[in-house]
Amino acid sequence: YGEPKLDAGV
């Protein structure tokens, strides 16, 4: 949800 590492949208 906005994490720069998990930028997939989850």
Curated annotation (Swiss-Prot):
UniProt source species: Rattus norvegicus (Rat)
Alphabetically ordered keywords of this record: Amidation
Protein name: Pneumadin
Residues that bear Valine amide: 10
Chain's role: This antidiuretic peptide triggers the release of ADH.
